[in-house]
Amino acid sequence: MGPQPEQELMGFFSSLGIMTTSEEGRLYPRSLRAESVRDALLNVCDRLGITLICGANVASAHKASEGWALQINRPARALKAKKHDDRKSELRSLRKALADVPRKNEALEARAVIIATGGNPTGIADTFSLPLTSLRPILCPVSATVVGDRAALKTLDGLRVRARLTLTRNHSELWHEDGEVLFRTFGISGVAVFNLSRRIQRGDTILLDVFPDLSKDELLDMLNRRVELLGGFSPRDPRWLDGMLAPQLSRVVCTAFEQCHPGSNDVVHLVSILKHFKLLVEGTAEERSAQVTRGGVSVESISTPSLHACSVVDAPLYVCGEALDIDADCGGFNLAWAWISGIRAASSL
């Protein structure tokens, strides 16, 4: 990324005419609209007379005397799609039109090639004989079940809680993060869960601490004061937890208490449930909406900082962005890598 990537990116965006603003250490276009960045980039391309060929596939690539000889397959005419009021419907129509449009072959010569295909570089990597690591979607929800109560997530569906998530494997802690958790019928979602999805394996355990701001001793003190106020706790009466937890979570917690500590009413055991609510990982979920793909062109096959393909010595070939097997947590890190790596590759031409 370099010694000062933030300053470098701000300078780059400024050179495009994009005004930026900072919020909680994150850089945004001042408009707070992603299309502002897209439009600024397209405007620069237009001013510089850069030709954009959209919807094309690279059918073959061969080294030429000065770079590359490419065969591409492109739409033979402009796309015709039904107009829609909302952008998503319009995009669906355009995708269908792109799939149905007649296509033609065309030869191109290129002094250099930069592969910036995003998360699925399989076809283009094969074309240029680049090694690939396996692909899988990440930064997405996690499929899981509540240990001992497979019906619990149906009860909790749609509930949001602030919690600390701890990922364990073979009784060893691997990772933890605080954040909002959204319960779904298939598992859990939310930004912290998306980050978790980068690290999970089937069979892992997620421990939810629904009182992350309190230590075990502080939570126990609070529960003991509650006993003095309301009387003794009973897992058969979830209403005892009213004012502490959402009713649906209270019911699930009481069920977990009875399963783990049958016959007990001891709030010491309740502390254990509230600080270590267990879910068993089954995998990732809603993968079509994943923000990032893990895997891609192997980083061992790329020279840094130029990002030139090591296996190609006599023709300029570079790989950048998500096409490389590099990924990061939520928070703008993947976008920052896309921008910076694009700048690095282009600067190497």
Task: Give residue ranges: language-model regions.
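Short, histidine-centered active-site or binding-site loop motifs used for metal coordination
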Residues: 24, 321-324
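Thr-Gly-centered strand-to-loop micro-motif
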Residues: 110, 320-321
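Residue-level recognition of phosphate/Mg2+-coordinating polar/acidic sites
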Residues: 2, 8-25, 93-96, 112-116, ...
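Active-site metal-binding loops of divalent metal-dependent hydrolases
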Residues: 119, 317, 323
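N-terminal Rossmann-like dinucleotide/flavin-binding domain of flavoprotein oxidoreductases
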Residues: 1-26, 30-51
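An active-site-proximal "capping" alpha-helix that borders the catalytic cofactor pocket
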Residues: 124-128, 336-349
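Predominantly flavin-linked oxidoreductase catalytic cores and closely associated redox partners
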Residues: 35-36, 40-246
